[in-house]
Every structure is written in structure tokens, then in C-alpha cells.
Amino acid sequence: MENRVNVRKANKKDSGKLLELIGYKAEFDRSMKGFNGEISTNKGKIERTLFGDVPFAHALLLEVDGKVLGFALFHYRYSSFRGEPSIWLDDLLVVGRHRSKGYGAELMHALKIEAGKSLASHISWTASPYNTKAHNFYKKLGAEVERMDGQRPYFRWAMYD
């Protein structure tokens, strides 16, 4: 039986689930030596900052057979010199045992659709230097390493040439 996969925009009712996913992302990042602090957000902050009158970021949720198994958290940027918007991907996560099943690609392709709607020239993000599996995944999508900060790669996925 094939799984039903859906990627949708998160809404205010998803704030608790987003908080849970952010916790999973922090655990994963700790394992990759990409984060060593404590999470200081909470459901109320997520509701105010993602779903208030002026959202500071947006989230896509990955659902498989109706169960949320991942998310992408992003915000828009604008270059005055280029006159172009772009997207900064803050977080991308597929929960533990559900990785390597193509779900990350589903999230990234949904994010690419969002980029197209906003006429974004590209999507950018960074990744832990130790997460080489993710580096390979991003390159397979067509993203390129735009620059390095020490050992940390910064990726750029162009939406058009």
C-alpha cells in the first residue's frame, strides 16, 4: 500500500506540533554538533510570531497518512541591489525513522513552489559540517555550495537561471 503524502502550510492550530518538531530538530542538531543551547520558544511565541498579524516566518508541514512527520520553517528576504526576493530556509526536518524515504524531497519541492509564487530567485540555507548525508541530498536536488564559513557550507538553490 502506498502512503498518502501531503505538504501543507501550517496554521495557528499547528503551533503545538511545530513546537514538538522544533524540539526534535534541536535534538538532531545537537547530535550533529550544530546546536548546543536550550530552546526558549513556546507555543504562545510560535502563535504570535508565525500566525500573528505580521508573520515573521512560515512553516510547511509534511503529513504521511494524516500524521505530521516533518516540517520546513522559512522566511522571505529581499535584495534591494538585485530587486529580487529570496527564501531563507531556517529548519528542515523529517522525523527519525521516516528519513531516507523521499519525504525531505517532498518538503523541498513544496518550498520550491512557494518560492515560485513569490518570484524568489533562490532558496538559501546552511547545514552542519558533520551532516554529509544532508549535503549530498541538497546537491542531488540541484543546490550548490555558495560559500563556506570555516567548515560550514551555505547552500543556494537557484529557482531559475
Predicted feature descriptions by range:
Residues V94, S100-I113, K140:
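Conserved acetyl-CoA-binding loop-helix of GNAT-fold acetyltransferases
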Residues E84-G96:
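Conserved acetyl-CoA binding element of GNAT-fold acetyltransferases
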Residues L61, K67-H75:
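Conserved beta-strand in the GNAT
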Residues N6-E20:
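A short beta-loop-alpha structural element at the N-terminal edge
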Residues G116-T126:
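Conserved GNAT acetyl-CoA-binding A-motif
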Residues N6, G23-R48:
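Conserved GNAT-fold acetyl-CoA-binding loop/helix
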Residues R48-L61, W88:
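A short helix-loop-beta-strand connector motif used in the catalytic cores of GNAT acetyltransferases and
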Residues A105, P129-R147:
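Conserved active-site alpha-helix within GNAT-family acetyltransferase domains
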